[in-house]
Amino acid sequence: MSVTISEAVKYIGVDDKTIDLFESQYVVPHGVSYNSYLILDEKVALMDTVDTRGVEQWEKNLLAALDGRKVDYLIVSHLEPDHAGSIGRLVELFPEVTLVGNAKTFQMLPQFFDELPVDENHKITVAEGESLSLGTHTLNFYMAPMVHWPEVMVTYESSEKILFSADGFGKFGALDYEDPEGWACEARRYYFNIVGKYGAPVQALLKKAAGLDIQTICPLHGPVLKENLGYYIGLYDTWSSYKPENQGVLVAYASIHGNTAKAAQKFAEMLRAKGVEKVSVMDLSRDDMAEVVEDAFRYDRMVLAAASYDGGVFPCMQDFLHHLQSKAYQNRTVGIIENGTWGPTAGRTMKGILETMKDITIVDPMVTIRSTMKESDLPAMEALADVIANA
């Protein structure tokens, strides 16, 4: 896909439409882009490479944009293989290229390329706030550790006011896919599942970015952002501070034979009847786990409904709670509905996991259903729905 940035700054990335799982776990039905950029000046700088899955098309894009010139510098923003995977091919094409990274970059580089033929004279180690002149363009480097790896750095090109933001502001989806839900949907799913654990480092990076005059954001996944940048930065501020983006309730259920599912659907109806405008109901056995995690962070309230299983909770609920725990889920109100036949254990298991998370308010009553939802269960469900609707 053709992407216009400026006369001197060229997009040379690739779309991957054949990948089924990003990082071997996140479904990407509309593919993903691996973004790479070229800055043409007195010196030529390449901003990251791409996954080896796209190396052939990337090489064609690179050579076409160079039009006979050579790459002087490779800026290594992030060493993850979907961005650094083609460094070896670049060095084959341009043996005299100089790699630019930080101390952590060069510490980690041999773990991925143990025989990369780049000597110390072809490495530049940069630190916070240092710069590299290409001629009329100047690259300014800012460290972004744990956004979302320790070696990550972003680059601000001051003449055209471009922020090369590494994985920040990235999203799922090939560049030629027009998402009917807009940028935020797949950017949110990407953020909370890839970067979500690292809210404090993202906040630190946003503070650095606030001091820069940014007119364009060039991420390593997803579209180049040029307009209404305050909208995107505002969302990142909300997400990284773990504030709910919207008022609403996620009802996530784990059902073995369909009885807990019926209770969850009934509970969702109760919430809607009480005026809750946004209620998202997710089946943890079948729905995309990354999307459920996304909704958990998006809304201010959550209700978990699960069957008891092997003295604990049905595994897909345990898996979901593990995802929330690992992504630093916090600052939310949660209700619990458990189901069990001879010894309900789901409720206390879910409660125990939730209690390990920061600032989670678990509300009463906890509803216990015995095997199937009955008329006698409805008053307790209504009581919980009242609490959740008014929380």
Where do the protein language model's features map onto the residues?
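Short acidic active-site motifs
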Residues: 86, 288-292
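Active-site metal-binding motif and surrounding structural segment of the metallo-beta-lactamase
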Residues: 42, 53-100
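Conserved beta-strand hairpin/beta-sheet module of binuclear metal-dependent hydrolase folds
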Residues: 3-64, 154-157, 161-165, 260
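Active-site neighborhood of phospho(di)ester-bond hydrolases with catalytic His/Asp-centered motifs
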Residues: 47-49, 71-79, 99-102, 163-167, ...
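Structural motif
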Residues: 43-45, 73, 137, 161-164, ...
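Metallo-beta-lactamase
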Residues: 3-7, 101-152, 198-204
